[in-house]
Amino acid sequence: DEWDWEAVITESDRTRHYLEDVVHRIYGAILRTEFLTCEAYPQLKPFLPKDIHFIHAQELLEMYPDKTPKEREDAICKKYGAVFVEGIGCRLSNGEKHDGRAADYDDWSTVAEDGKVGLNGDILIWYPVLGRSFELSSMGIRVDKVALLRQLEIEGQEEREQLYFHQQLLSDKLPLSIGGGIGQSRLCMVMLHKAHIGEIQASIWSDEMRQECEAAGMSLI
C-alpha cells in the first residue's frame, strides 16, 4: 500500500540537483508529520534527524566493500539516521547492482551533472524500534526515450519497445516526469513507533504469529 505520485518536469529538471531538492521536500514533510504526531501523542518522542544524507550506491560500496547491500544500508543509516541512496539499478564496480530496478521505470543509467550514474534512489531511515534500516520511499526521475532505449538494451529487453507505454514515450506523446511511492503502512509504523505492520494494518495472521507477537507485547489488528 503506497501513496504513488508523479509530477511533470522539464528537460532542464532532469538533474541530480532537482532530484535531491524533491527528496528534501518529501523528507521535510515526513519530519513535519513526525512533529505533529508526537505533539498529539506526547508519549512518543521524535527520533528522525533534521537533515537527510545523500550518498551514491557506488560510494556506499567503497565505504563498506565487505558488506551486502542490506548491511551497507544498515551501516550508513545507523551513522546518519536518514539517507537517500542514489543510483539504484546501475551496475557498480563489483559488477553487481545495489538492488534491481525495471528498465522502463526510473532512470538509473544517465550520467548526471556530477559524473555519477543514475537519477533515482531510496529514502531510508535508521529505525530504532527494529534496530535496522527501514525503507520509506523508492523514487526517481523517470526514463526519457534515450534512457529507455539504453536501459532496455542493457537488460536485453529490446522487445518491450513495442509495448503501448514504450511507444508513447518513444513518440514524444508523454511528458517527462519524476515520481515514486511512499509506503503508507511503513510510514504509519514509524510515526507510531510500531514494530509489526499488523499493529497498524488490518490483515490475516496465523495463530502462531499472533501468539508470538502477543508474547512480545504487540497487539495485531
Positions of predicted regions on the chain:
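Alpha-helix initiation and N-capping motif
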Residues: 2, 16, 23, 162-163, ...
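Hydrophobic N-terminal alpha-helices or hydrophobic patches in metabolic proteins across all domains
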Residues: 10-12, 16, 74, 81
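A translation/RNA-centric and nucleic-acid-associated enzymatic feature enriched
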Residues: 59-221
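Alpha-helical scaffold segments that mediate packing/assembly in large oligomeric complexes
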Residues: 31-67
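A structural signal for alpha-helix termini and helix-coil/disorder junctions
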Residues: 29-32, 36, 171, 193
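Residues forming anionic-ligand binding surfaces in small-molecule and nucleic-acid pockets
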Residues: 1-10, 166-167
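A conserved active-site cap/scaffold subdomain adjacent to cofactor or substrate pockets
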Residues: 15-33
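Low-complexity, flexible helical/coil segments
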Residues: 18-21, 39-44, 172-175, 214-218
